[in-house]
C-alpha cells in the first residue's frame, strides 16, 4: 500500500506489535500483519490447516502483494511474523529484524498474558529456542536493537530507511 514498503520481523516478544502501534501513533501507515493478514496454513502451499501451531502461522500472500501494489500511501510498514515470508520478502524495499538479548526476552515472556502466544511455558521454550537458532526469521534483514525504549527503536528504523 505504499510507494515504499518495509517488513518488520522478529521472534515473539521482540516488539513488533509495539513498533506497529508507535508507527501508527506517529501517523504512518502500518499494518499489524499478525492481526490483519495471518491465518493457519501450510507455509509452502497456503492451504488452510485445522491446527493452530506456530509453524502454520502464515500471511495471505495475495493480500500482501495487493497491499504492496497499491500506491495510495507513501510508506507502508508491515509488522509481524509469518512462516511464509519467503513467498513475498523480495517485494519489500527493506526488511528489519527486531532483536533483544535473552534477559530482555525472558522478562517480556514472563510478562506476557497466558492467552497470548508465548504465555504458556511450552510456547516460551519454543520462543527461546527460536531466539537462539534464528531459524524462522529473515536472515538478511537489518538488525534493530529492540531493547531500547520504543521511541528509539522506531527512530533507528527511520534512520535505516533514510539510508536506503
Question: Where would I find each of the regions flagged by the language model?
Answer:
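The Walker A (P-loop) glycine that initiates the GxxxxGKT/S ATP-binding motif of P-loop NTPases
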Residues: 10
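Conserved glycine(s) of the Walker
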Residues: 15
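Conserved Walker
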Residues: 18
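Conserved substrate/cofactor phosphate-moiety recognition/catalytic segment
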Residues: 21-64
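Loop/turn-to-beta-strand initiation segments
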Residues: 72-77
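Small-molecule kinase domains that catalyze NTP-dependent phosphoryl transfer to phosphate-bearing small molecules
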Residues: 85, 114-159, 163-164
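Conserved phosphate-donor/acceptor-positioning beta-strand/loop module used by diverse small-molecule
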Residues: 91-111
Amino acid at each position: 500500500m505504499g510507494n515504499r514498503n518495509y517488513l518488520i520481523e522478529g521472534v515473539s516478544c521482540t516488539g513488533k506489535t509495539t513498533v506497529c502501534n508507535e508507527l501508527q501513533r506517529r501517523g504512518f501507515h502500518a499494518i499489524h500483519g499478525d492481526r490483519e493478514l495471518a491465518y493457519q496454513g501450510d507455509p509452502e502451499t497456503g492451504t488452510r490447516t485445522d491446527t493452530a501451531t506456530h509453524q502454520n502461522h502464515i500471511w495471505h500472500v495475495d493480500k500482501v502483494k495487493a497491499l504492496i501494489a497499491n500506491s495510495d500511501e507513501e510508506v507502508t510498514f508491515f509488522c509481524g511474523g509469518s512462516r511464509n515470508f519467503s513467498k513475498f520478502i523480495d517485494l519489500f524495499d527493506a526488511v528489519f529484524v527486531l532483536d533483544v538479548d535473552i534477559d530482555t526476552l525472558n522478562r517480556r515472556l514472563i510478562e506476557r498474558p497466558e492467552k497470548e502466544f508465548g504465555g504458556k511455558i511450552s510456547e516460551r521454550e519454543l520462543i527461546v529456542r527460536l531466539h537462539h537458532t534464528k531459524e524462522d526469521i529473515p536472515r538478511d534483514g537489518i538488525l534493530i536493537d529492540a531493547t531500547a525504549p520504543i521511541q528509539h527503536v522506531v527512530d533507528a528504523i527511520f534512520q535505516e530507511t533514510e539510508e536506503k
